[in-house]
């Protein structure tokens, strides 16, 4: 499906056929998201417990490598060929090759029979009604706040945060009620399966809290480096694209290999502590500023993911902090995905992994408004100290749930 849509969009002009082009772009987003869910479900089903860590690390490393392909190589091809149509056609052929390779080499997996779900038509109707209900709930929450004289476009970030939290508070229970009311069995039974387990709410809290400190720090890292410390865009881009991306891939692979030896609980604990410590690097940058450790020069280069047509000076402190932070993030993400894999029941692996990973992204998505308010209010050094403190609740909960995590790993 992705190959076909990519091929079709290559034949269109966004200027002459904007509506059809936009529709195909939406289709690409829908199909790619569906592909992610199916792949995660397949990986969850086929990997035995002792291979979840390494499998998750390989997935993280491959995902980052694919980002290089789509975000770096594609632009190089576009410049060389002077044609985005050829780039999309090439991507279509690559997707077709991946589909053929999947058919040829992917392990067949026969899922154990489970409970019969509702008819697909009824499920689709329930899903559509749930989306409509969520949209209506968001509109209603905004309307109520507007009636009280608040403006959703107000420059005050506290007011923007109030709108966001109000919309979530009304939309989430509305979605769950509609799913129950209209028989969205895939979602309902997935939730029932999860919440009948021992300590389900504690596990959900751990999922939200584990990456929270990392999410707080990452949400404002780039504005901090560019606006506060006055690093150049080229310097930050070079460090992030080369050292940061390389460190995250390396960290994911190292984390996977370590999980084979130390197990899931200790991996989550050790990598979580490393993520906490890495936030102090930005605290030191905020205290001492640029130039503390000196700098080094990069000669001109042209590689797959980046190019530089002149010599550039790179700050050693910046490079070191970003390398350590991305290394820790890669290791922590690999362990975190291994936990989500272990938590997903084989009968509902697609739905449960998608829901759990979405829950794990709550911090990353919704802390940005809070961070945007907090950093100017308390200052950058205090903000990064706060991000480190926000990593502690997840680690403390992880320690308290040690026996439960070990039990989950062995399932």
Which residues does each predicted region cover?
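Short amphipathic helix-loop junctions that connect adjacent transmembrane helices
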Residues: 149-154, 210, 219-237
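Intracellular juxtamembrane helix-capping segments at the cytosolic ends
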Residues: 33-47, 331-345
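Intracellular loop-helix junctions on the cytosolic face of multi-pass helical membrane proteins
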Residues: 10-20, 49-209, 398-411
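C-terminal transmembrane helical hairpin of 12-TM major facilitator-type secondary transporters
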Residues: 266-336
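Helix-to-loop junctions at the C-terminal end of transmembrane segments
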Residues: 78, 250-270, 285, 290, ...
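A late C-terminal transmembrane helix in Major Facilitator Superfamily
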Residues: 245, 343-377
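Loop-to-transmembrane helix entry/capping segments in MFS-fold secondary transporters
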Residues: 49-58, 233-235, 346-356
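Small-residue (Gly/Pro/Ala) motifs that create kinks and tight helix-helix packing interfaces
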Residues: 69-78, 222, 255, 367-375
